[in-house]
Amino acid sequence: MTAATDPAQEAQWKRWRSVADLYHAYFTGLILTVVTRRGTADAAEFVFRVFRRQQQERFLPGLEKLGLSHLPPAVAAAQYHYLSNWIGGVHVEYMYESDRKALIRYPPPRWIWKGTAICGLPGEVSRAMLRGWHANNGVALRDLRLGFVCTKQSVDGQDGLEGYYCEYDHPPELDQRPVFAR
């Protein structure tokens, strides 16, 4: 790479970043529109479906690309969210506790609900995101003992979204994937 191409690559990166910011703002606005015009239940269902589809399309291929598929399920799931979000520019924290338990945290400000938009989002909508993606990682990994426990949510007035992947001794019931414990 020469010095002459650096400004061109930087300009290209800024253009792509602008498109990403535009799509992100559109998505957030769309969710807020559904909340105000159709109600919380419809907005939660919409968010659930978007995130479940993304999870089904991206999670397993992403584990392979990131070199995580050999890890224990709880660790693989948490590291996937840590690395894939960092690559996408989202600040995430990760902590390994054991092969059966790994923690993730999305500190404020929350990327997904940028700025003051977070004030217009009911907790049910944020929980739908976790039900759509995080709760289905064990199913995708063919380990039905893997669940996700959410311990904090920004939309509920707490300092960030955080929780942990846990491999239980037995498969949790469908409605216990994820668990919301505070």
Regions found by a protein language model. Give the residues of each.
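N-terminal accessory segment detector
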Residues: 1-103, 110-129, 136-182
